[in-house]
Swiss-Prot record:
InterPro entries assigned: MFS_dom, MFS_sugar_transport-like, MFS_Sugar_Transporters, MFS_trans_sf, Sugar/inositol_transpt, Sugar_transporter_CS
Chain positions covered by the region annotation Disordered: 1-42, 568-587
Sugar-modified residues: N111, N231
Bias (Basic and acidic residues): 19-35
SUPFAM superfamilies referenced in this protein's UniProt entry, alphabetically: MFS general substrate transporter
Organism expressing this protein natively: Kluyveromyces lactis (strain ATCC 8585 / CBS 2359 / DSM 70799 / NBRC 1267 / NRRL Y-1140 / WM37)
Alphabetized Gene3D superfamilies for the sequence: MFS general substrate transporter like domains
Protein name: Lactose permease
Low complexity: bias regions: 1-10
Similarity comment: Belongs to the major facilitator superfamily. Sugar transporter (TC 2.A.1.1) family.
Biological function: LAC12 mediates the transport of lactose and it would appear that the permease works in part by a proton symport mechanism.
Compartment annotation: Membrane
Length: 587
């Protein structure tokens, strides 16, 4: 049996800077050799008396249904409400743009890119503009960014509701989009940063499932007002007013949430971060073996950089500084584009037009079908959020996008068949494939769309990665929504065929480049991205075990050195006291 005490004591004598991040893990050529070398020295090490091989095992932490996490879930639920804003807007505009009262009120043409298309796409312009202010959440914190964003959406919703002209409506929608982007960037970042590694898939994944809740409320409120106030401005004005409901709730209850522990460490408030972890991760246990380890990992990840430093906060060059940074940025860009350009935006915003193209022309029926579509996607996304930590991110993406391509193939065939024959069976088949597409796509992409970009980013670049994410997704949505009315009118079902081939392209890219993040701490992922091939490293279990052992050893050294410093302080004071007594006696 190894002599644990001798191993620990030998490490305690080493200064903390003997294990350097770059020297140990930064050289691609010697990457695995360095990890193997570090791993050889980890035998017998403990953290607070717990062997390192057990330090990250979930046996030390309860499951997601444990009562100790209820407080954490309460915090996250408040931020989840931010996800409803884009879902509400998508279903709202997708429901009201076919209403005659709405089209006449604002003098719009349903197939006009400069009319209906512009009203839709201005939201994406506002999103792109708002994205450039996302890094400000590094300045004052995630919580203020969430609150300011939601307050801005409330004001924008009031403007949109009171307007009587198309220009004012467009302005109000830009205002909503601008501030919704700030809140929608800060909220998933907050969820990813406050969640323990073994729960992050569920905690952060559930965030975007409330996109469908906003969509459901918008669709059915529009359906209700359309039934009760036909041919009246109330049919679309009331849903426009209701757009402020969810962000208003965040403004009221958002003051109750504490700040993200990772942001607190990034601005030097380490004790507050430690208290957060003790309270929300470890059920108040100040002696838990993972406390010092988690804190040490977070502290090291910032490399002494002040997160709120204006020069650092606005410097987007950090997204592309190193090879691993560029790989991360590539994944953020791909995820942002794929999340909006897989055919899902067409279904979200233009479902009524899709239904009209297969013979379903009743406005109230189309609005109702829009609501049912939202329910289908919501249920599927919740299932995905709970399974994503079991099947993994890569398998989830690959399964969803391949299923989506098959569903769009079926939709293309049924739509083409209906155009030729006008048969009811073809129309019903198209409806089935629309819902199949929504359910399959939402299973993986909805819970992971906002989560994945935060997972693959570092603590230092997460806000800037969100900037990149929202700019790219905004451009993708703008292209989609501005071009879709014309495309659906002119090329009809061939528009769906285009997305079939694009989804196949996505499958290939995801298979060869996307990194698996399941179960890794955000700090462990930093090591994965430094590997010569991050995608291969992320699924190499032997490599990941070495990474974990290396990080645990590093943390053990830090803890030991910190304890030594604390022990030396009283000894020093005692020595001074004895020296003073000796001087007094000699006098």
């Amino acid at each position: 049996m190894a002599d644990h005490s001798s191993s620990s004591s030998s490490l305690q004598k080493k200064p903390i800077n003997t294990i350097e991040h770059k020297d140990t893990l930064g050289n691609d050529r010697d990457h695995k050799e360095a990890l193997n070398s570090d791993n050889d020295n980890t035998s017998g090490l403990k953290i607070n008396g717990v062997p390192i091989e057990d330090a990250r095992e979930e046996v030390l932490l309860p499951g997601y249904l444990s009562k100790q996490y209820y407080k954490l879930y309460g915090l996250c639920f408040i931020t989840y409400l931010c996800a409803t804003m884009q879902g509400y807007d998508g279903a709202l505009m997708g429901s009201i743009y076919t209403e005659d009262a709405y089209l006449k009120y604002y003098h719009l043409d349903i197939n006009s890119s400069s009319g209906t298309g512009l009203v839709f796409s201005i939201f994406n312009v506002g999103q792109i503009c708002g994205a450039f202010f996302v890094p400000l959440m590094d300045w004052k914190g995630r919580k203020p960014a969430i609150l300011i964003g939601c307050l801005g959406v409330v004001i924008g919703a009031i403007i949109s509701s009171l307007t009587t002209t198309k220009s004012a409506l467009i302005g109000g929608r830009w205002f909503v989009a601008f501030f919704a982007t700030i809140a929608n960037a800060a909220a998933p970042t907050y969820c990813a940063e406050v969640a323990p590694a073994h729960l992050r898939g569920k905690v952060a994944g559930l965030y975007n499932t409330l996109w469908s809740v906003g969509s459901i409320v918008a669709a059915f409120s529009t359906y209700g007002t359309n039934k009760n106030f036909p041919n009246s401005s109330k049919a679309f004005k009331i849903p426009l007013y209701l757009q402020m409901m969810f962000p208003g709730l965040v403004c009221i209850f958002g003051w109750l949430i504490p700040e993200s522990p990772r942001w607190l460490v990034g601005v030097g408030r380490e004790e507050e971060a430690r208290e957060f972890i003790i309270k929300y991760h470890l059920n108040g246990d100040r002696t838990h073996p993972l406390l010092d380890m988690e804190m040490a990992e977070i502290i090291e990840s910032f490399h002494g950089t002040d997160l709120s430093n204006p020069l650092e906060m606005l410097d987007v060059r950090s997204l592309f500084r190193t090879r691993s940074d560029r790989y991360r940025a590539m994944l953020v860009i791909l995820m942002a584009w794929f999340g909006q350009f897989s055919g899902n935006n067409v279904c979200s915003y233009y479902l009524p037009t899709m239904l009209r193209n297969v013979g379903m022309k009743s406005v109230s029926l189309n609005v109702l079908m829009n609501g049912v579509y939202s329910i289908v996607t919501w249920i599927s996304s919740i299932c995905g959020a709970f399974f994503i930590d079991k099947i993994g991110r890569r398998e989830g993406f690959l399964g969803s996008i391949s299923g989506a391509a098959l569903a769009l193939t079926g939709l293309s065939i049924c739509t083409a068949r209906y155009e030729k024959t006008k048969k009811k069976s073809a129309s019903n088949g198209a409806l089935v494939f629309i819902y199949l597409f929504g359910g399959i796509f939402s299973f993986a992409f909805t819970p992971m769309q906002s989560m994945y970009s935060t997972e693959v980013s570092t603590n230092l670049t997460r806000s800037k990665a969100q900037l990149l994410n929202f700019v790219v997704s905004g451009v993708a949505q703008f292209v989609n929504q501005f071009a879709t009315p014309k495309a659906m009118k002119n090329i009809k079902y061939w528009f769906y065929v285009f997305y079939v081939f694009f989804d196949i392209f996505e499958f290939i890219v995801i298979y060869f480049f996307f990194v698996e993040t399941k179960g890794r701490s955000l700090e462990e992922l930093e090591v994965v991205f430094e590997a010569p091939n991050p995608r291969k490293a992320s699924v190499d279990q032997a490599f990941l075990a070495q990474v974990r052992a290396t990080l645990v050893q590093r943390n053990d050294v830090r803890v030991a050195n910190a304890q030594n410093l604390k022990e030396q302080e009283p000894l020093k004071s005692d020595a001074d006291h004895v020296e003073k007594l000796s001087e007094a006696e000699s006098v």
